[in-house]
Amino acid sequence: MKMVKELDAGPILFQEKFKIKENYNSEQLGLELFNIAAQNLNQTVKKIADESIKEISQDHSLATYTNMIKKSDGLINWAESGELIIRKLKAYSQWPGLYTYWNDKRIIIKDADFQKEENSEFEKNGQIIELNDKGIAIKTIDGMIHIKSLQLEGSKIMDASSFVHGRPSFISSNLN
């Protein structure tokens, strides 16, 4: 992008479309974008130097704006849809991380999947249902989050099974 006074407003000097893989988190997406930029940097700089670059004007009506990300944005609201929770996991993978609390200790979720399903009305959102072959099953408003790996504050990253076997009281408890 060509530098102008306004933020992210200059003409585009290089652009390439690619499909974002469904399982990408922000770190993986950043690495993919870095690799694309690195592969095309020399060619783009040469075109700028010999003035053969074709500037592409941005359509400012398509611009979107967001707020600054705060650490508290990573706190899971178990009343949200499981799909939204997984999107936040992908978006906040580098910072602030997606986290919840158990026994007043912060747990950072490192890897998880969502399965949409009918839930029992007797289970509470954020309740840990079981450890199964998909991970630690936690009830959401519209299904189950299956945590594959997580990190208790002050500890190393663990797979779901290792975490639960060291903390059997974790199953059936509630996260907040």
Spell out what each predicted region is.
Residues 1-72:
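Donor/substrate-binding cores of folate-linked one-carbon enzymes
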Residues 67-68, 73-84:
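Active-site loop ensemble at the mouth of alpha/beta enzyme cores that anchors a bound cofactor
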